[in-house]
From Swiss-Prot:
InterPro entries: BRCT_dom (IPR001357), BRCT_dom_sf (IPR036420), DisA/LigA_HHH (IPR041663), DNA_ligase (IPR001679), DNA_ligase_AS (IPR018239), DNA_ligase_CS (IPR033136), DNAligase_adenylation (IPR013839), DNAligase_N (IPR013840)
Any one cellular-component term (Gene Ontology): cytosol
Identification of the protein by name: DNA ligase
Function: DNA ligase that catalyzes the formation of phosphodiester linkages between 5'-phosphoryl and 3'-hydroxyl groups in double-stranded DNA using NAD as a coenzyme and as the energy source for the reaction. It is essential for DNA replication and repair of damaged DNA.
GO biological process assignments: DNA repair; DNA replication
Catalyzed reactions per annotation: NAD(+) + (deoxyribonucleotide)n-3'-hydroxyl + 5'-phospho-(deoxyribonucleotide)m = (deoxyribonucleotide)n+m + AMP + beta-nicotinamide D-nucleotide
Length: 680
């Protein structure tokens, strides 16, 4: 063996050892690295074997499925009737097109790749005989007792004339916890004295391996069937036909599966779900594409670990590791001081991030992160990235503990909790703390308040730091002369620039706005758009609100004692009242005419709107629902009364169909608004 070959073999051995180690940790619920890091290791090993076929051996990690059942497992081993294969992955559009090019088909199925735990079910004459984990694809753990308490898994299949129950049926599926149920599952676990789960997949995997059936019942496990193994007395012509049969027998199938004939439509589906992955009822990490025709599947065959007739397109990771360089704090508009992580830039969920929230000092301690740690971060959609925790195994002793500041980093005021048991520490200098002032300005300029387009984060900070504004009370008195001292709103020649002129124009227009938006803009703690709408709708003026007794305020629908008390407390402060007085003097809306109140046609109804409507903007459709007594919700559940479906509707429409909810088009929605009934 030459020195070069020896080095290649050492490289292969090192990679193979890492892949085996991390795969075992993953399948036995002790992952040390995110899925994306494992995928990268696996792909590196695959590429090495493709470039140097002589390195591949029969037991290479690229040739095997899953991981052997752990020796310490408390469950019995059970052999699958037919091998339970994995899936090969592609990670970009070109790789997908290459696969489609060498795997032509009359029809493909696209299915969401559920981020859960694989399960194998065996039915004999319709009766559930056993359930098992994937294991190494040949042998898994017998988890029949746990599977029997999952409501989605029928104990007895129900045959029909079209689909008689076969003598033997082996089902492949995925067990998961819905995104909606996960917070409650975690809350229950904490109440029981346990540590919270990091994510729904870990929760599902841990739950299936519980020995205590009562604990399994608490976890709200769900299951979706996504394939068949060995069968006797059942020979469907296509995957689609198989799913129809499974559904007829009472087995759950995915509401998101779609049939497509054009490869270009497959690419479009991948793109669609990249943007809508958080619309699904479960977590997903990719889209699975399958050749639908089963005869074609047999002709294409499989490798030792995966079928050639299916592929998984993996989306950019939402959990990755990076280095925690520092922990700093930011000051919010209500004085709350929030620690955040400063990290080495890393690509996560399709964007590069270098900062992530740590919520409060209690969370920093609970998560056990040290400055210098390698940490796992998560970013879901547009959500701010969050540090999940440290990779303790990678510590080298140079890490150091974070010490939470005792003084405000913006103004030097001593920090303190608002009350003894408050986990959040606050800067009490609300009147003149630059950090609070600039964030309050940014907030009141937002779409949910005055909607001042030309006043962004940099502009707000500039107005405060330069002393142009001492607080928000003088905002509507700004003039061109005032802006000449600005660094953001002036040209290099020292004149007011286009942004400055736009700001002054925005300010004039925003004075005449809805009263509820003015209430939101005041940054009264706990008073958000919902409470502000309710208060403005009942009292119609700031003065009437000030004069209203506390008990009366608290009885306002959607307000309650805490919000009412917060409102009263805010107006006890002289400089707060000065803000209102100066805004009023500048012509800002302080009362609104009591016009004809819209008929409460939607009273008590919860309505979800998905997709675009021709006659409404996003804000106006919400206003139309709320002003008629309805609740405009952003998520579909069993409690939803109507789902309004417009152009380019997301998977909320699919979920509504799955739940059997009433679905309306725009015309039906307008009828509902006007008459209280969607019927023609």
């Amino acid at each position: 063996m030459t020195e070069d070959n020896a080095q290649l073999r050492r490289t292969w051995n090192d990679l193979a050892e890492k892949v085996r180690y991390h795969r075992d940790r993953y399948y036995n619920e002790q992952p040390e690295i995110p899925d994306a890091d494992f995928d990268a290791l696996f792909k590196q090993l695959q590429q090495l074997e493709e470039d140097h076929p002589e390195l591949a051996v029969p037991d290479s990690p690229t040739m095997v499925v899953g991981a052997p059942v752990a020796e310490q497992s408390s469950f019995d081993n059970v052999e699958h009737l037919e091998r339970m294969l994995s899936l090969d992955n592609v990670f970009d559009e070109q790789e997908l097109r290459d696969w489609l090019g060498r795997t032509p088909a009359k029809q493909y199925l696209t299915e969401l790749k559920i981020d859960g735990l694989s399960i194998d079910l065996v039915y004999r004459n319709g009766q559930l005989e056993r359930a098992a984990t994937r294991g190494d694809g040949r042998v898994g753990e017998d988890i029949t007792a746990n599977a029997r308490v999952i409501e989605d898994i029928p104990h007895q299949l129900q045959g029909t004339d079209e689909y008689p129950v076969p003598a033997v049926l082996e089902i492949r599926g995925e067990v998961f916890i819905t995104v909606e149920d996960f917070p409650e599952v975690n809350a229950q676990r904490i109440a029981d004295g346990g540590k919270p789960f990091a994510n729904p997949r870990n929760a599902a995997a841990g739950s299936l391996r519980q020995k205590n059936i009562e604990d399994v019942k608490k976890r709200r496990l769900r299951m979706i069937s996504h394939g068949i193994g060995f069968t006797e007395g059942f020979s469907p012509a296509s995957q689609h036909d198989a799913y129809l049969a499974l559904a007829a027998w009472g087995l759950p199938t995915s509401p998101y599966t779609e049939a497509v004939t054009d490869p270009e439509d497959v690419v479009k589906k991948v793109s669609y779900w990249a943007d809508h992955r958080h619309d699904a009822l479960h977590e997903m990490d990719g889209l699975v594409i399958k050749v639908d025709d089963i005869a074609s599947q047999r002709a294409l065959g499989s490798t030792s670990r995966a079928p050639r007739w299916a592929i998984a397109y993996k989306y950019p990771p939402e959990e990755v590791t990076t280095k925690l360089l520092d922990i700093q704090v930011g000051v919010g508009r209500t004085g709350r001081v929030t620690p955040f992580a400063v990290m080495e830039p890393v690509l996560v969920a399709g964007s590069t991030v270098s900062m992530a929230t740590l919520h409060n000092q209690s969370e920093v301690k609970r998560k056990g992160v040290l400055i210098g740690d390698t940490v796992v971060i998560r970013k879901a959609g547009e959500v701010i990235p969050e540090v999940l925790g440290p990779v303790v195994e990678l510590r080298d002793g140079t890490e150091r503990e974070y010490i939470f500041p005792t003084l405000c980093p913006e103004c030097g005021t001593r920090l303190a909790p608002a009350k003894a048991d408050d986990v959040d520490w606050r800067c009490p200098n609300m009147q003149s703390c630059p950090g609070q002032l600039s964030t309050r300005l940014t907030y009141l300029a937002g779409r949910g308040a005055f909607d001042i387009e030309a006043l962004g984060e940099k502009g707000a900070e500039d107005l405060i730091r330069t002393g142009i504004l001492l607080d928000e009370s003088g905002l509507f008195d700004l003039t061109e002369d005032d802006l000449l001292s600005s660094n953001v709103y002036t040209t290099n020649a020292g004149k007011v620039n286009a942004s400055g002129k736009k700001l002054l124009d925005n300010l004039q227009k925003s004075k005449q706005t809805d009263l509820w938006r003015v209430l939101v803009a005041l940054s009264i703690r706990h008073v958000g758009p919902t409470a502000a709408r309710a208060l403005a709708g009942r009292y119609h003026s700031i003065q009437a609100l000030i004069d209203a007794p506390l008990e009366e305020l608290s009885e306002t629908d959607g307000v309650g004692t805490i919000i009412a008390q917060s409102f009263k407390d805010w107006f006890e402060v002289d400089w707060h009242k000065a803000i209102v007085d100066k805004w009023a003097a500048a012509g800002v809306t302080m009362e609104e005419e009591v016009g004809e109140v819209a008929e409460q046609t939607l009273e008590g109804l919860t309505i979800v709107v998905t997709g675009g409507l021709e006659g409404f903007t996003r804000d106006s459709v919400k206003e139309a629902i709320i002003s008629r007594g309805g609740k405009a919700s952003g998520s579909v559940s069993k409690k939803t009364d109507y789902v309004v479906v417009g152009e380019n509707a997301g998977s909320k429409a699919t979920k509504a169909e799955e739940l059997g909810l009433r679905i309306l088009d725009e015309a039906g929605f307008v009828r509902l608004l006007n008459t209280g009934s969607a019927d023609e």
